Amino acid sequence: MEKSTRTLFITIVITSMLLGFGNSDLAQDREECTNQLIELSTCIPYVGGDAKAPTKDCCAGFGQVIRKSEKCVCILVRDKDDPQLGIKINATLAAHLPSACHITAPNITDCISILHLPRNSTLAKEFENLGRIEDNYNSTSPTQIHKDGTGGGKAEPVKSNGWKEKSWLGVELLIYLLVSLIFF
């Protein structure tokens, strides 16, 4: 029950964040990435620094998002400090997610061109720094993941409650749909 409540809360937070965007570019990003960002909700304990490694569900969702839209991952890292997000995201851990999940993904520095950032902007420099951190990690041997984003690890297995989790997922999706219909 605790996991279902947490997942429901995360879904509501992400939906609220996406509803809060104001200008047209952000509104377009919201529209484009809503479903993909919800698939990443299981990664929040890891990218928030509360879990040693991403879960298998997180890695599966992350892999789907990378295949569908790299831009959405870039948007999430870009907006990590947005107070409307309502959650903390450690950008180093977010950039490390492909390695932690053993997923081939473009370098985080590709976000500079994906998001059309000026090369000399603060945000572009932040993406470049994240890319260097990840390159340095990949050139060293894996160790334990720490809250500060250093080290490495393997995805943690997820215990399943069978149909109970699936029924909560249905409830969460229904709530998301209702909220979307009300506010869109």
From Swiss-Prot:
Which residues, per the entry, are lipid-modified as GPI-anchor amidated serine? Answer: S160
SMART domains xrefs: AAI
Q: Where, per UniProt, does this protein localize?
A: Cell membrane
Annotated region Disordered: the residues are: 138-158
Q: How does it sit in the membrane?
A: Lipid-anchor; GPI-anchor
Q: Which residues form the propeptide?
A: 161-184
Please list which residues make up the signal peptide: 1-24
Effect of a null allele = Increased susceptibility to penetration of the epidermal cell wall by the non-host mildew fungal agent Blumeria graminis f. sp. hordei (Bgh). Some early aborted seeds and infertile ovules, and increased salt permeability in seeds associated with an increase in unsubstituted fatty acids but a decrease in omega-hydroxy fatty acids in seed coats.
Disulfide-bonded cysteines: C33-C74, C43-C58, C59-C101, C72-C111
> One Pfam family, short name please?
LTP_2
Q: Fetch the Gene3D superfamilies from UniProt.
A: Plant lipid-transfer and hydrophobic proteins (1.10.110.10)
Gene Ontology CC entries for this record: nucleus; plasma membrane; side of membrane
Superkingdom, taxonomy of origin: Eukaryota
Identify the tissues in which this protein is expressed.
Preferentially expressed in the shoot apical meristem and the root meristem. Also present in the ovules and developing embryos. Observed in cotyledons, hypocotyls, flowers, leaves and siliques. Up-regulated in the epidermis of stems.
This protein's UniProt keywords: Cell membrane, Disulfide bond, Glycoprotein, GPI-anchor, Lipoprotein, Membrane, Plant defense, Signal
Q: Which InterPro entries match?
A: Bifun_inhib/LTP/seed_sf, Bifunc_inhib/LTP/seed_store, LTSS
Q: Which GO terms describe its biological process?
A: defense response to fungus
Major location, coarse class?
A: membrane
State what this protein does.
Answer: Lipid transfer protein involved in seed and ovule maturation and development, probably by regulating the fatty acids homeostasis during suberin and sporopollenin biosynthesis or deposition. Contributes to pre-invasive defense against some non-host powdery mildew pathogens by preventing the penetration of the epidermal cell wall by the fungal agents (e.g. Blumeria graminis f. sp. hordei (Bgh)).
Q: Give the family this protein belongs to, as stated in its UniProt record.
A: Belongs to the plant LTP family.
Q: What is this protein called?
A: Non-specific lipid transfer protein GPI-anchored 6
